[in-house]
Amino acid sequence: ADAHEVLGELGVHFEAAANEAGAAAMLGASINYPLRGAATWKSVVGTNVASDALSNLSSAGVVGGAMIVIGEDYGEGASIIQERSHSFAQKSQIWLLDPRPNLPSIVRMVEKGFELSEASNTPVMLELRIRACHVHGSFETKDNVAPKHSRRNPIQKPVFNLERIPLPPHNYTQEKLKIDVRLPEALKFIQREQLNEFFAGDLRQIGIILQGGMYNTTIRALQQFGLADPYGESRIPLYVLNVTY
C-alpha cells in the first residue's frame, strides 16, 4: 500500500485480502487472461486455508503467470505447526521454487518464476524459508515494466472457455494436460534457463544434491568439517535445486 503511487503509474492493482482463500481466488484472473498475479501468505496454515482455490487454479492451469509467495515457517526458529508446503505442490502439481538464501538468487527466481508459470501454464510457489527471510545483502535492480493489460489498458473482450472449468468432462482433460504438456514444458524451461545450480568442488568421489533453501545450512555444516569456507566455496560438488518440484 505504501507503494501506491508507483503501482498506480504501472497500472498494478494491490488488494489486502481478508484471508488466504480470498488472496488465492484473486489469482483466478490468470486462468483465462494474460494477466500476471501474485499472492502471499505465511505457510503452512495459510496454504491450508487457500487449498480449495489453489486446487482449482492448478487444475485449470493459467495463461498469465501466477505466483504464490509463501513464508515457509518450518524448522529452527519456527513459530507454528511443523508441516511443509512441499506436499501441497506435489498434490496439486504446482511448481515449487526454493531459492538459495541469497538476494540476487531470490530476485532472479521471482522473475523466472513468472516466466516458468507462463511457459508451462502452471501456477508456481516461491517459498522463502526462515533463513531466506532474514538474509542480508544487495542486488542490482532492473527497470519497471508495465503490464500489457491493466486498469490503464483493459482487455476489451471477456473470455469464456468451458474447457477451463474444473468439472467433468474437462477436469479429466486438465489432469492429462498436467503430465503430457505442462510438465515437459516446465522441464524444458528449467533446463534452458539453468534455474538449478551446480557448484564444482575438488573432491569428485561424492556430491550432494540439496534443495536451494538448504544451501546456507549445508555450507555451514561442511565448514565444521573443513570442507567449505565462510564464502560458500565447497570442496564437495553441490547440485542446488532452486526448483525443488
Tell what function each PLM region has.
Residues 100-245:
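Flexible, low-complexity linker and terminal segments
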